Amino acid sequence: MPHFKVAIVGAGPAGYFAAQALQNLANEEQSFSIDMIERLPTPWGLVRSGVAPDHPKIKTVSKVFEKIANQENFRLFANVEVGSEITINQLKSKYDAVIIATGSSLGKKLGIPGEDLRGSLSAAVFVPWYNSHPDFVGVDTPLDADTAVVVGAGNVAMDVARMLALEPSELDPTDTAEHAIDAFKSSNIRKVYISARRGPEHAAFTSPELRELPKLEHTNVVINKEDIKAAILRAGAEPEKDVKSNLDAMLLIAENPKSEHERTMEFLFQHTPKEILGTDRVEGVVYSTPHGDVTIKCGLVITAIGYQAQGIDGVPYENGKVVNTDGRVEENLYVVGWAKR
């Protein structure tokens, strides 16, 4: 009976689900032994360092990972960096197949002036900072201004904006990093804008996350009702199901505004950032809008506009992902998950 030795590089969700797929292929005619190699001391990738701490239910998938790891012929080698401590070619010489499952950990850039100022961060840095990722404990996160801007129209952007706009005591029962809780408790931020380049009908938020926003106990959530009405007209009589769900959720927020709280999270649509203003640090953002340029004064800008893969020596990359054809990179080398997309 053929027995295949497989190395999986990366111990995040993609790596574990690749291992599970191999385990499910095992039968009386073939078997697999799986060695998972992780750069960090702990596994689970984004489930550990990328999920908003106030959404603990998402982390229950770790129980699935534990079940996968407890299967026969599975081993985890943590604290080992592929590309420096061991090369891809060395792995290929020792295994029948090598699977790259390292995810996409680098934040995409806006490519506008001022992006390198102090107070301009990527969500790829900010999110692991508040999630206790060992690489990001010392990140400079200035929260001393009263206004922050989050650029992006997906759930990561919404998570970041929500974390900034929450009453910090709400984070005490969560597994938010202690250094982050301390920083949030001393934060001066009271207004958070979340800005999207296109209209509400194009936003990549998901409706369950949008429907949670009115439940925030200490935060006003503001959406311009006219923006949503215009988006509903643009979406047409039969919009896609996800678009309709999003617009319905946003309209509900827009029609039931709150203003009694000290903290506010406000959505801005059709706002394209042109420049981040400042001399030594962030002082504002200039946006292009359908009604002309608009400047928002702020002391913190966090971009959440997508991710790209971190390169590994010996693996071909292009446009922030591993070069592949249907997951195959080259002979005996494959890629899965965000590093593939």
Go through each PLM region and give its residues.
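Dinucleotide-binding/catalytic capping subdomain of oxidoreductase cores
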Residues: A26-S33, R162-P290, T325
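Glycine-rich dinucleotide-binding loop and its adjacent helix/turn
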Residues: G107-S186, N319-G327
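Beta1/beta-strand and adjacent pyrophosphate-binding region of the FAD-binding site
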Residues: P2-G12, D144-V151
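N-terminal Rossmann-like dinucleotide/flavin-binding domain of flavoprotein oxidoreductases
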Residues: S33, P41-A97, L247-E262, E266
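FAD-site-proximal beta/loop scaffold in flavoenzymes
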Residues: G119-V137, I276-L277, R281, G292-R341
